[in-house]
Amino acid sequence: MITLAVDAMGGDQGLAVTVPGATAFLQAHPDVRLIMTGDETQLRQALTAAGAPMERIDICHTTQVVGMDEAPQSALKNKKDSSMRVAINQVKEGKAQAAVSAGNTGALMATARFVLKTIPGIERPAIAKFLPSDTDHVTLALDLGANVDCTSEQLAQFAVIGSELVHALHPQKGQPRVGLVNVGTEDIKGTDTVKQTYKLLQNSKLNFIGNIESNGILYGEADVVVADGFVGNVMLKTIEGAVKFMSGAIRREFQSNLFNKLAAVAALPALKGLKNKLDPRKFNGAILLGLRGIVIKSHGGTDETGFRYALEEAYHEAKSAGLSKIEQGVAEQLAALETAKAVQNENVGGL
């Protein structure tokens, strides 16, 4: 039986999204129990109204909620009984294999880092997410917004934890291909930090394939793509906006005249398949990667379907036990990175 902790009060709409999303998820997974944190009276009423299977839900009453615009340090210091903090505590205490929250990203990252700590050798956790491609291939992208300013060592650490996670989840595919997001594929391009990261990864034991431009990510050119949080977040929001724009443009075009409406009827099966593949809700649920525990961040503005998919991500991560398998591999890869860094410093000093 998999047990997940759910911050029921987090997100733009709180219980209106988390409860129906959790109910639908439980109905699809009889092997799951949920610990839902939040105001017990409100939670019980909402769960009963939604027809949730109460025999597989434990309610953990909390008295506080982290605001969506609340400063991370304020949440960490003043909201120790928040639904977010208590959900993460369930993972720390071994009562749940993963925690899911649609709450304030900064507060979630700060709280999770404080409660769970990071994997030894990893300075900062990163927001990581699996993105679709034009095939059935998926690519793990990180960092998507947690760290807007990174050193080359931190970017290299992201590459290590991303590569180790993908390898743990798909060992049959061999060493994951790691790409560094840049403005061009040549090793002379990019900021000083990116160029230094390139050299570190080039001399590491990772399967580093070099720089990758953002327009190649959705074509499955790499299994792991690494960027700082500023670039990664802009990249992610651009992809989400482009998908939304294209979906709307196709819909408007097919509704523009009678001939196009008839054509839409004929193309309906293909259009449904395309809509399903591009539905951003299916890819809701980002991993706070680098922590000693599983925490999944749901988009704060998602609906019940999107929240259900965030729970699906937590379920698959918990069931695969991928994160529990990566610490040894991370330690070995980080040791190789230190060697690469020493060689790089020697080369610079000899100039």
Curated annotation (Swiss-Prot):
Record's subcellular location: Cytoplasm
Pathway: Lipid metabolism; phospholipid metabolism
UniProtKB keywords: Cytoplasm, Lipid biosynthesis, Lipid metabolism, Phospholipid biosynthesis, Phospholipid metabolism, Transferase
Top class in the EC scheme: transferase
Gene Ontology molecular function: any one: phosphate:acyl-[acyl carrier protein] acyltransferase activity
Pfam families: FA_synthesis
Catalytic activity: a fatty acyl-[ACP] + phosphate = an acyl phosphate + holo-[ACP]
Biological processes per GO annotation: fatty acid biosynthetic process; phospholipid biosynthetic process
Domain of life: Bacteria
Family: Belongs to the PlsX family.
Subunit structure: Homodimer. Probably interacts with PlsY.
Function: Catalyzes the reversible formation of acyl-phosphate (acyl-PO(4)) from acyl-[acyl-carrier-protein] (acyl-ACP). This enzyme utilizes acyl-ACP as fatty acyl donor, but not acyl-CoA.
PANTHER family: FATTY ACID/PHOSPHOLIPID SYNTHESIS PROTEIN PLSX, PHOSPHATE ACYLTRANSFERASE
Protein name per its UniProtKB record: Phosphate acyltransferase
Taxonomic source organism: Neisseria meningitidis serogroup B (strain ATCC BAA-335 / MC58)
Species lineage: Bacteria, Pseudomonadati, Pseudomonadota, Betaproteobacteria, Neisseriales
Gene from which the chain derives: plsX
